[in-house]
């Protein structure tokens, strides 16, 4: 594959463009002169977050990218957005997925979905802001419209999944990857944040993005 010319990083739920992994990728890519963008999914309102809005923001970021191969790097819920964005935008020619939340399941942070539906909002801890914030049930309703398992993705995909992930079931990721020969799944001994695997993730992503040959 040709070297990627532009990378768009899609951060996870209750995270931000200042996440440690986003910052690491931006710094490393700058050494190669690769342009970088990271939409802020907390804006204009975290409370009103939906997958559809995240996809719209990703569309705008892809549209603003320089000409040439574009890679999406998605973390957790950002990875869910990345796989759906990839089928919508031909400019995207490869994906890196980090602990991909391929379905919302029981909701974020051990949410009681029935209670969330009844009250219309969920109180969660926002890691980037280090405080509790509300998010509306519209996030869960909207996410249910999107099925990552039904997507026909032909582009190369590199996936990193922790075997000790407490938020994303590793078996779900393995099942998603099993029927897709274009997916290179790397299981690592790590938790959801993949903090202990950042060096390995960059090393393999560097090659996958065409920046360093084996």
Segments (PLM) and residue ranges:
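Aromatic pocket-lining residues of Rossmann-like dinucleotide-binding sites
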Residues: 29, 85-89
């Amino acid at each position: 594959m040709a070297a990627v010319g532009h990378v768009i990083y899609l951060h996870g739920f209750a995270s931000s463009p200042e996440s440690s992994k986003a910052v690491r990728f931006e710094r490393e890519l700058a050494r190669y002169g690769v342009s970088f963008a990271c939409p802020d999914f907390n804006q204009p309102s975290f409370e009103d977050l939906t997958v559809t809005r995240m996809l719209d923001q990703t569309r705008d970021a892809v549209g603003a990218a320089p000409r040439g191969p574009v890679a999406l790097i998605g973390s957790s819920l950002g990875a869910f957005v990345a796989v759906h964005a990839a089928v919508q935008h031909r400019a995207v020619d490869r994906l890196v997925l980090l602990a991909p939340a391929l379905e919302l399941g029981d909701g974020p942070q051990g949410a009681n979905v029935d209670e969330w539906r009844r009250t219309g909002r969920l109180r969660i801890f926002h890691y980037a802001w280090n405080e509790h914030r509300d998010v509306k049930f519209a996030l869960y309703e909207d996410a249910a419209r999107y099925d990552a398992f039904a997507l026909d993705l032909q582009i190369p995909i590199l996936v990193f999944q922790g075997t000790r992930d407490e938020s994303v079931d590793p078996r779900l990721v393995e099942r998603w990857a099993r029927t897709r020969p274009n997916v290179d799944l790397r299981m690592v001994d790590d938790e959801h944040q993949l903090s202990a695997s950042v060096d390995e993730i960059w090393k393999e992503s560097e090659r996958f993005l065409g920046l360093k040959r084996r």
